[in-house]
């Protein structure tokens, strides 16, 4: 599972997930990409399950890049514990996603295979996504 090796602080405030993805919104490594259309959070488990779906579908052909990393800790209090007595322990890690953020990239496969693979991966994610191709400038 993806998570930072070490952080300056163990816990973070909830914060806001506003705006559009300015960084990481272009296809930079591969030929085809899966881009988010909606805003939300991706947990490390969701990122990993989508990656597995991608790699299983393309088999050995092609190279895959994961363009998101879960770097925000989400804390949770244990069940049946009263309120107060401090913030809960870190339960899992998330990546905050804005509309326009490229999530996965792939190259070395046909467009048809890439579309099928991204459709399988998108089914594992809680966000609306779209298929994009690299534009040559």
From Swiss-Prot:
Biological processes, Gene Ontology terms: translation
Gene3D superfamilies found in the cross-reference section: Ribosomal protein L10e/L16
GO MF assignments: rRNA binding; structural constituent of ribosome; tRNA binding
Gene Ontology CC: cytosolic large ribosomal subunit
Protein purpose: Binds 23S rRNA and is also seen to make contacts with the A and possibly P site tRNAs.
Similarity comment text for this entry: Belongs to the universal ribosomal protein uL16 family.
Quaternary state and interactors: Part of the 50S ribosomal subunit.
The name this protein goes by in its record: Large ribosomal subunit protein uL16
Natural source organism: Pseudomonas fluorescens (strain Pf0-1)
This protein's encoding gene: rplP
């Amino acid at each position: 599972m993806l998570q930072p090796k070490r952080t300056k602080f163990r816990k973070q405030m909830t914060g806001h997930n506003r705006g559009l993805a300015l960084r990481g919104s272009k296809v930079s490594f591969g030929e085809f990409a899966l881009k988010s259309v909606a805003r939300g959070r991706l947990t490390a488990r969701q990122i990993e399950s989508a990656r597995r779906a991608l790699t299983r579908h393309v088999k050995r052909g092609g190279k895959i890049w994961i363009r998101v990393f879960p770097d925000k800790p989400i804390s949770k209090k244990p069940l049946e514990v009263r309120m107060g007595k401090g913030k809960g322990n870190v339960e899992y890690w998330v990546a905050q996603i804005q509309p326009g953020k490229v999530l996965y990239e792939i190259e070395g496969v046909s467009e048809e295979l890439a579309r099928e693979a991204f459709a399988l991966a998108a089914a594992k994610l809680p966000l609306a996504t779209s298929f994009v191709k690299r534009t040559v400038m």
